[in-house]
């Protein structure tokens, strides 16, 4: 599509932009719920981490909309550093766990599903050849769901809530 051209409300590009907007908006709610937390990962509060992610999602939304904006590799590294620091602070995961240990943990679990949907919608738009995005954008979106998962676990861990595995019975 050409710059300034109207796009269909049902296009893959519009769906991708909508999914990114939903994720960003939901992360705003998570950020409000996280304001009172005092713990830090890589020197950043939970609120700081989410704020950085929201800023980066605006860059990705601009890129998906056709603007000359890209996510830089250092932003992916920031996500990976947070994921690694959270994982090192907790016991290793042995199985899937039930969402909802704490309110914040549950919110991060929902954010994780929004992040995965946004990633799928962006990939769908790329595969439909409606948009073109950089590899770093795809990598960032992929790692973002991992960050949300790590922060869900870390939130529960810091609150002293034990993870509960599904029973499969």
Each language-model region and where it sits:
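Phosphate/pyrophosphate-binding loop motifs in nucleotide- or prenyl diphosphate-using proteins
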Residues: 1-169
């Amino acid at each position: 599509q050409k710059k300034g051209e109207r796009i269909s409300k049902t296009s893959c590009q519009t769906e991708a932009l909508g999914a990114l907007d939903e994720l960003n908006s939901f992360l705003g709610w998570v950020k409000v719920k996280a304001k009172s937390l005092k713990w830090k990962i890589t020197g950043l509060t939970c609120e700081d981490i989410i704020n950085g992610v929201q800023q980066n999602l605006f860059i990705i939304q601009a890129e998906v909309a056709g603007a000359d904006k890209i996510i830089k590799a250092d932003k992916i590294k920031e996500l990976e550093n947070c994921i690694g620091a959270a994982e090192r602070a907790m016991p290793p995961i042995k199985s899937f766990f039930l969402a909802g240990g704490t309110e914040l943990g549950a919110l991060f679990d929902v954010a994780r599903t929004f992040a995965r949907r946004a990633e799928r919608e962006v990939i769908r738009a790329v595969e439909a050849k409606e948009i073109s995005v950089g590899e770093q954008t795809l990598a960032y979106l992929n790692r973002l769901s991992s960050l949300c998962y790590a922060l869900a676990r870390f939130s529960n861990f810091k609150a002293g809530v034990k993870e509960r595995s599904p029973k499969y019975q």
